[in-house]
């Protein structure tokens, strides 16, 4: 069986767990090139992982042997990069969130649909064994009908995470902790309880 051939765009903080997984999957996936506009980040990545480095995104996208692109850049760049990837006929696995606004996110989805490429989003918590087992249990109906759902987000990042320039800003990330960490819990809730029918809120004073 031939291996899936991919390119990586973005060699910042998010790339490490992906690269570790790709090392384990080398029998199934070949990394054709790992791109960053930063020579420093390319060098740091190359010192840690056995994948070819690339300093020209256009050249990587022009490579007809590349099947898909793994996009790990800040959220405010997603639409523009997705346009380029989709325009080159590459399927896309995109780090969450889609982009920083609803309008940009909808345009990104429409762009991929128009180009006939598959778009996937990195929201991995729904695939954890416990989440899969719970989803199957809920789907069986043994617990009855879900009529409401609430969640508590228990995630933490050190200050060094937020020291990265622009981290948690509306301009780069589209918001703070809800989009950077809380999105995983919200996605897990959706995967277990189904689409949202109604949203309510309250504030304590």
Residue ranges and their predicted role:
Residues 2-4, 117, 144-147:
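Nucleotide donor/acceptor-binding cores
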Residues 125-205:
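Predominantly a Rossmann-like dinucleotide-binding segment in NAD(P)-dependent oxidoreductases
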Residues 42, 81, 108, 133-134:
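Aromatic/hydrophobic pocket-lining residues that form π-stacking "cages" and hydrophobic walls in ligand
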Residues 1-48:
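N-terminal Rossmann-like dinucleotide-binding module
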Residues 29-33, 67-69, 175-176:
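Short active-site oxyanion
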Residues 72-73, 192:
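Short, well-ordered coil/turn residues at beta-beta hairpins
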Residues 52-64:
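Short acidic low-complexity segments
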Residues 68, 74-75, 79-126, 141:
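Beta-strand-loop-alpha-helix segment that lines the small-molecule cofactor/substrate pocket
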């Amino acid at each position: 069986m031939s291996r899936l051939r991919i390119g990586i765009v973005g060699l910042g903080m998010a790339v490490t767990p992906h690269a570790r997984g790709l090392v384990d999957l080398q029998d199934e996936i070949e990394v054709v090139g790992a791109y960053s506009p930063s020579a420093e980040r390319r060098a740091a990545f190359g010192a840690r992982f056995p994948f070819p480095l690339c300093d020209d995104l256009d050249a990587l996208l022009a490579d007809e042997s590349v099947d898909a692109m793994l996009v790990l850049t800040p959220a405010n760049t997603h639409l523009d990069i997705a346009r380029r990837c989709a325009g080159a006929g590459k399927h896309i696995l995109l780090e969450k969130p889609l982009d920083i606004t609803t309008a940009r996110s909808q345009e990104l989805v429409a762009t991929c649909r128009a180009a006939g490429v598959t778009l996937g989003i990195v929201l991995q918590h729904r695939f954890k064994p416990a989440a899969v087992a719970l989803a199957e249990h809920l789907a069986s109906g043994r617990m009855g009908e879900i009529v409401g759902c609430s969640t508590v987000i228990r995630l933490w990042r050190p200050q060094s995470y937020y020291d990265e320039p622009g981290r948690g800003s509306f301009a780069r990330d589209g918001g703070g902790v809800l989009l950077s960490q809380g999105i995983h819990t919200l996605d897990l809730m959706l995967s277990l309880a189904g689409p949202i029918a109604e949203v309510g809120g309250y504030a304590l004073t």
